[in-house]
Amino acid sequence: MTKIFKHLAKHWAACLVIIALLLVQAYGDLTLPDYTSKIVDTGIQQSGIADAVPEVVRDSTLQVLELLMTDADAAAVEAAYTQPGGTGNALSSATSLQKKLASPYTVRLLRADADRDTLAEVFSTPDIVLYLASAQAAGEGNAPDAAALDTVTAQFAAMTQMPGFSRDAVQAQLAAAIGQAGESELSGLSAQAVLLVGLEYQALGISDAVQMNYLIQTGGRMLGLTLLMVAAAVLVGLLASRVAAAIARDLRRGVFRRVVSFSASETDKFSTASLITRTTNDVQQIQMTCVILLRMVAYAPILGIGGIIHVAQAGSSLTWIIVLAVALLLALITVLMQFAMPKFRIMQKLVDRLNLVSREILTGIMPIRAFSREQHEEARFDAANTDLMRTQLFTNRVMAAMMPFMTLIMNGTSLLIVWFGGKQIDAGTMQVGSMIAFITYTMQIVMSFLMLTMVAVMLPRAGVAADRIDEVLTTEPAIHDPVPEAIPADLNQHHWNGEVAFHHVNFTYPGSSEDALHDIDFVAKPGQTTAIIGSTGCGKTSLLHLITRFYDVTGGSVTVDGVDVRQMPQSTLRGLLGYVPQKGVLFSGTIDSNLKFGGENITDADVRSAARIAQAEEFISAKPEGYESPIAQGGTNVSGGQKQRLSIARAIAKHPKIYLFDDSFSALDYKTDVALRRALKAETGDATVIIVAQRISTVLHANQILVLEDGRIVGKGTHAQLMESCPAYQEIARSQLSNKELDLKGGEA
């Protein structure tokens, strides 16, 4: 996993922006339940009245309320209100409500600079007393209304006119009543203060306006917050996708560059199918994981911690339900992961296996049909496919079983909250909106743990993919450029002739205990053709691979113009070579693009000259599009001979100093072979030509012929010399040519 985070660290700026946006999104998610609670509790149940402080109040009602306050509190209330059009700056909402009064009452408006929290404490007890008095005036079984409030205020006003009335006596009676009431009774009466404000608004004819104003304002804030959350979520998704895509791009680029630098031994170590899987499937797995890490792993802790803080601030006694839900969820995930995790590790290997079988079948479809092995290969593919299917079915079933259980836990959690929360609502210690908010916070906390556990399921598989990719990226190629100090100082100014020399070379393939080549010693001179012939598996191709540095020698040295190839940059060495592999390889594109594959400086004239020398001009001209004719992937839309001639033309167009032909003429008929070699001899001029061949006719006129047997040179010389001195060469020659063709007198060797 640390490998994935290292890749993310390269995009730290974008990650910081994503975290900032996630904080904005989490703020919205955590604030919306509060607004929902306010809409239910305040906007609906309390008719939009948030506290015990009326924003608009009649003079008559305010005077009665002040009677029930201390002198200091009454003075504070007087200072907090102003008359319409007075010198004080009234609250904007109070001014708006004053314009909607049903009758021209004499009212006071709450000042904009009033301390509402302090006023709420001051108004609380007088509001409760006045509401209870209004309820008593309404009569048993009747809800108090504006008329009852008017009756009570009139009674209080009349009482103040009675002889012997004392405000201090009223305060003393009120204090005694409060002292006799228990704390629970006072808590239960706290909501009555808001109801008194509702009666006052009802008397003023603005109760509906107050409620609608509150709902519109709160709903507007919720809408604005929701839009902000949506914008943040969209930006998070965009940035996370871009970061993940950039990481995937860099990984694919890194894997490609590393694979291109691999020698044949590293390619054999990983296998082509595995390298393809690592470059595609594994990189895609990491890309998906990076998106999830940025969108979920970073978001889940923010949401969970924020939900816990809100629940703690609410001081609810239902927090044990959250602990129970999280514990059950973690237990469920732990049990399921014990079954699923081993299968996730196996799945990647099975994907490699399926890719390998598919590649073998598709590349070998012709031999499969020729030998009627379709059923056998179908059985092979079916076995690999079935193994992968069974593993995927098992993991999918485990993951599918997770969702019903998690749904059960979440629904059970909601049920417990409603059950125990309902009892608290009945007791008056919780409001409906608060319970709704608590359910929402609980779901957010549970979902945050759920997101983390879901990511925990994916991370091991992504970790395996990251390890597989890292294995490729950290594998050092066996063939690498020399350090600058080891490169000859005059190499860049060196005039290359192309003389290739093997100095007592030994070579052993990686992992093998026996030499593939032993004590190879010869010189291939410019302007001459050196041919290498021998039985299958004697080391002919291996010898060419040492010149190209596909492998390095294990003993001795290979030099070009006296410079050890290991002391030359690979680009310099291969810039001197025109290599035609044993199996012609073409790339998707056109004939022209394939022939110009050897370098950027190849002109159209070079292409046409090379095609003419390689005897490819005739069939190219016969195509409607000529040199712009398309070539399918792997050259599947041309014949074997045409593919080989195009491969030869590609090497010729480069005008190299050294030509390497690895049994390149075997796919050609004799007539084309002779014509091609005749034209090639005129073209190569002073270049060094090294030909690996199976046919004697191909090497008959070479200046130097090397006969290989079991990795050793058993003969060296011209055709005539070898016919006299090398039994191995004589055996090959007699098996292919008649005595007349061998130009032997009397039919004898």
Range-by-range predicted roles:
Residues 306, 310-327, 331-333, 337-338, ...:
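Helix-loop-helix
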Residues 44-51, 58-65, 153, 160-167, ...:
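Short intracellular "coupling" helices and adjacent cytoplasmic loop segments at the cytosolic face
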Residues 28-44, 216, 225-268, 272, ...:
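Juxtamembrane helix-loop junctions of ABC transporter transmembrane domains
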Residues 25, 29-33, 224, 229, ...:
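Alpha-helical transmembrane segments
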Residues 1-32, 36-223, 228, 232, ...:
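Membrane-integrated ABC transporters
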Residues 10, 166, 264-265, 281-290, ...:
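An intracellular "coupling" helix at the cytosolic face of ABC transporter transmembrane type-1 domains
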Residues 15, 51, 65-67, 87-88, ...:
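ABC-type nucleotide-binding domain
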